[in-house]
């Protein structure tokens, strides 16, 4: 993701996702926001060993934590001071050897859930609406189907602030021509050519 070519689907209400297609088959990406800080979110993608992703070491649901900062992205300092873009490995290993990478995607060895109390857990860098640094949303019953699709259940356990944040987070992100996310307000960006709502926009 973060390429600007396809807008992710926001998960903010309880939902059962069935037969989510692989990214290589133009499948959807889902996004779950920190309700207290819209630039922090989790992305869900179905990554399968097929097409232009045939060389992957694993297949399944990839959960990525993003703590977006325009300054960090522009300076290429995304993961220097802290992790702003990281895969939440199903085996809870940050090692990059092949055996460890093979355990990155869900489900893996019985781990088919992601939430406040799972390992790894859905933690945050910025406070949520309740003051905690927990997402308060969970993904359960992650299943990899025989045809390469993924199914899972999403539950929103937040009780405050949801409607207000949804209005903000529904704004489409803006990207530069290198696929770097620049923010949400075109008026605040310098002159140039951007990708917005899937189209090139000149400011």
What are these regions (language model features)?
Residues 1-3:
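Extended catalytic-interface subdomain
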Residues 159-203:
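C-terminal outer-membrane/trafficking sorting elements
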Residues 9-159:
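Non-catalytic C-terminal accessory/binding modules of secreted extracellular proteins
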């Amino acid at each position: 993701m973060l390429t600007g070519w396809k807008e992710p689907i926001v998960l903010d209400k309880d939902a059962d996702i069935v037969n989510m297609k692989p990214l290589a088959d133009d499948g959807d990406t889902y996004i779950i926001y920190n309700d207290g800080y819209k630039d922090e979110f989790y992305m869900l993608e179905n990554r399968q060993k097929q097409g232009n992703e045939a060389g992957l070491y694993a297949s399944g649901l990839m959960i990525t934590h993003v703590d977006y900062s325009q300054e960090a992205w522009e300076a290429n300092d995304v993961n220097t001071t802290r992790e702003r873009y990281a895969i939440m490995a199903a085996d809870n290993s940050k090692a990059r050897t092949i055996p460890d990478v093979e355990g990155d995607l869900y489900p893996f060895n019985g781990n088919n859930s992601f939430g406040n109390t799972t390992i790894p857990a859905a933690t945050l860098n910025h406070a949520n609406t309740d003051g905690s640094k927990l997402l308060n949303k969970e993904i359960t019953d992650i299943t990899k189907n025989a045809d390469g699709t993924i199914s899972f259940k999403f539950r929103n356990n937040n009780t405050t602030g949801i409607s207000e944040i949804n209005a903000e987070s529904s704004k489409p992100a803006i990207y530069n021509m290198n696929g770097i996310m620049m923010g949400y307000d075109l008026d605040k960006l310098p002159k140039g050519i951007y990708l917005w709502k899937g189209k090139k926009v000149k400011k």
